[in-house]
């Protein structure tokens, strides 16, 4: 008798083995085992039926548990490494310094109301409002601090693919785009009334972003909106008139994502043709192309000036570009499971490998040190730009299904008015000194950084991670 098992456990194991042998047509082996066990095990057809399949279930359970144990051991090792490298002083500094904050499990809130996958999220630049769009055709407005649903905004007739806050000075708007080929503008100060619908694209509109105030030479600063579409074009809109003022053609396939520079001079866009393009908005022409991805590009991001010192080191520059320069470094995420970092000339700086599935969204930390990414592998990954882009934190099982979107709450702007007077999705508007030099809009007090991110998923949930 095994010393590891009690008499009852041994008897159940024998019955399970006999039932298994009988189920796989090894009747002679089953008969032999029963004969050898003799009176120690009483088993009939009913007992065989009862124990049939039990051995396989226990075997698969053990395999699952072993995998879970390995995952937990890996997480524990990562946390221990993080703890070992920290001192009480550095831990205190991290707690006080928002530039060092990174999200960690569990989320502060899990927001549930959508009836189909969540495709996009966006933070109000001033208030604690969070907008989410879904394949269920609705936009939900949440109070992310309280974790409560404020309202459901209806108007689109097909999936909502992207949302963004921004607009002219003095009045923040919410823009949304959809598979119904339209862009809609909503007024948060008037119960999210639909104030304008922008038709014009010939296929699904996959991304929409307000262009920040201060676009060089533009008389419509703050009034511009850019959209990207499956019709292979980017369109620039005047939100006050609803007119399309410019169409940018050059991509040869679906344009899935677009990001404007902080001063509104440049657009960075990419999609199914695997070739990101940096557009000069005033000239309406491509300034640079970026070659390297091996599959569809799902997301793009422009690095803030705070990241320039770290990215300059990675790219081998002796000194970083001027903080007043608005489009020096970029990030792209792809279905090839990689994230790639680029300079403005189209040179590949670094390839980040770690995700096990499509990379769906990117966000640079406002403090400049980190890049965050989410993926269909259900994780959030935090990459440290000061450590050769080492992945310093992984939040596993962020959602129960593919993670489709990620947004960082924009920094609070000190002069924001009651209507949310800020740049695109809270991007600080570029300012000018008395001598005419442009100041770094990210050089504001660190206290303005909001340590809040939101993610959305195919599991129909929005999750908020915050201090």
UniProtKB/Swiss-Prot annotation:
Pfam families: LisH_PAC1, WD40. One of its GO terms (cellular component) is cytoplasm. One of its GO terms (molecular function) is dynein complex binding. Residues 60-87 form a coiled coil. Keywords: Cell cycle, Cell division, Coiled coil, Cytoplasm, Cytoskeleton, Microtubule, Mitosis, Repeat, Transport, WD repeat. Its main location: cytoplasm. It is found in: Cytoplasm, Cytoskeleton; Cytoplasm, Cytoskeleton, Spindle pole. Residues 417-437 have a biased composition (Low complexity). Gene3D superfamilies: 1.20.960.30, YVTN repeat-like/Quinoprotein amine dehydrogenase. Residues 9-41 form the LisH domain. One of its GO terms (biological process) is microtubule sliding. SUPFAM superfamilies: Lissencephaly-1 protein (Lis-1, PAF-AH alpha) N-terminal domain (SSF109925), WD40 repeat-like (SSF50978). The keyword Cell division applies. Positively regulates the activity of the minus-end directed microtubule motor protein dynein. May enhance dynein-mediated microtubule sliding by targeting dynein to the microtubule plus end. Required for nuclear migration during vegetative growth as well as development. Required for retrograde early endosome (EE) transport from the hyphal tip. Required for localization of dynein to the mitotic spindle poles. Recruits additional proteins to the dynein complex at SPBs. Belongs to the WD repeat LIS1/nudF family. Self-associates. Interacts with nudE and dynein. PANTHER family: WD REPEAT-CONTAINING PROTEIN POP1. HAMAP family: lis1. Dimerization mediated by the LisH domain may be required to activate dynein. This is Nuclear distribution protein nudF 1. It comes from Aspergillus clavatus (strain ATCC 1007 / CBS 513.65 / DSM 816 / NCTC 3887 / NRRL 1 / QM 1276 / 107). The lineage of its organism: Eukaryota, Fungi, Dikarya, Ascomycota, Pezizomycotina.
């Amino acid at each position: 008798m095994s010393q590891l098992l009690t008499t009852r456990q041994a008897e159940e194991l024998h019955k399970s083995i006999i039932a298994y042998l009988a189920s796989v047509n090894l009747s002679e082996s089953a008969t032999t085992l029963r004969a050898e066990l003799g009176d120690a095990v009483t088993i009939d057809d009913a007992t065989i039926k009862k124990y049939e399949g039990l051995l396989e279930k226990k075997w698969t359970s053990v395999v699952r548990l072993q995998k879970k144990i390995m995952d937990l051991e890996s997480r524990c090792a990562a946390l221990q490494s993080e703890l070992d490298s920290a001192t009480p002083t550095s831990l205190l500094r991290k707690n006080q310094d928002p530039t060092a904050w990174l999200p960690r499990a569990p989320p502060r809130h899990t927001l549930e109301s959508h009836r189909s996958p969540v495709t996009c999220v966006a933070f109000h630049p001033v208030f604690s409002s969070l907008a989410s769009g879904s394949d269920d055709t609705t936009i939900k407005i949440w109070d992310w601090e309280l974790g409560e649903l404020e309202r459901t905004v209806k108007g689109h007739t097909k999936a909502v693919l992207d949302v963004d806050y921004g607009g002219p000075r003095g009045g923040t708007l919410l823009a949304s785009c959809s598979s119904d080929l339209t862009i809609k503008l909503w007024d948060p100060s008037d119960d999210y009334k639909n104030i304008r619908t922008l038709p014009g694209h010939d296929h699904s509109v996959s991304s929409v972003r307000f262009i920040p105030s201060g676009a060089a030479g533009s008389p419509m600063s703050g009034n511009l909106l850019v959209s990207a579409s499956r019709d292979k074009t980017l369109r620039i809109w005047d939100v006050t008139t609803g007119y399309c003022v410019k169409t940018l053609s050059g991509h040869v396939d679906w344009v899935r994502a677009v990001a404007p520079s902080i001063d509104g001079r440049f657009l960075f866009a990419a999609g199914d043709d695997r070739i990101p393009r940096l557009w000069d908005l005033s000239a309406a022409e491509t300034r640079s192309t970026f070659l390297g991805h091996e599959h569809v590009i799902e997301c793009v991001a422009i690095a803030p000036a705070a990241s320039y010192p770290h990215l300059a080191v990675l790219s081998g520059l002796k000194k970083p570009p001027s903080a007043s320069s608005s489009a020096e470094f970029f990030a792209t995420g792809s279905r090839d499971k990689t994230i790639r970092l680029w300079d403005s000339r189209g040179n590949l700086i670094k390839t980040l490998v770690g995700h096990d599935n499509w990379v769906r969204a990117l966000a640079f930390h406002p403090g400049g040190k980190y890049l965050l990414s989410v993926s269909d592998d259900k994780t959030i990954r935090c990459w440290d730009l000061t450590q050769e882009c080492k992945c310093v934190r992984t939040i596993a099982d962020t959602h129960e299904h593919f993670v489709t979107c990620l947004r960082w709450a924009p920094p609070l702007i000190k002069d924001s008015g009651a209507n949310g007077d800020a740049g695109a999705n809270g991007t600080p508007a570029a300012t000018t000194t008395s001598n005419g030099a442009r100041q770094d809009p990210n050089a504001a007090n660190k206290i303005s950084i909001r340590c809040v991110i939101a993610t959305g998923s195919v599991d129909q949930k929005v999750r908020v991670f915050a201090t």
